[in-house]
Amino acid sequence: DVTAQVLTVKSFPLSIDFKGRIEVQGEAIMRLSVLDEYNKTADEPLKNARNAVAGAIRNLDPKVTEKRRVEILFYNVNYIENGDIKTQEECVEFLKNSGFKVHPFFKVCKGISSVMSAIKEIEFNRKTLDILTDGAVVKVNDFSLRNSLGATDKFPRWALAFKFEAEEVTTSLGSLLSQFKL
């Protein structure tokens, strides 16, 4: 149970105007600038933002989560009592209007060329973003069409992930020590 840890996340609204049961879905992140700032004073610097977030949420001490300044970007409403959300666009608007933080790159596209242009825009801008991103997810906007398309055992047929080429870095090997046992 990570409830205590999540309650320390400033981007997680502790109350919303909607009166009823709701289940939302999001992704916990650490901004790269926050990681850099944290590492300047940390006894043990964190290797990367993804591991930092996972460790902060799984940690038994909520103060660790709070100190790492984790954020949550929400992207889906899995269930809404007496709600009538018909599209992903309406879903994101509901989340924003309810005080949930959403990813700034959400975009509704019309046609394949518009989709491909949006993917290229994200890939082009990814180095300037303050968050890690390794790709883009394209989803069918209309929920009734999503239901018609269904899913396989593992994945929805109405969503497609585009992964960007991995970023590579070069490092120098300072020394090499070989040991053999005979």
Model-derived features: where do they sit?
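RNA/tRNA-interacting regions in translation and RNA-turnover enzymes
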Residues: 1-182
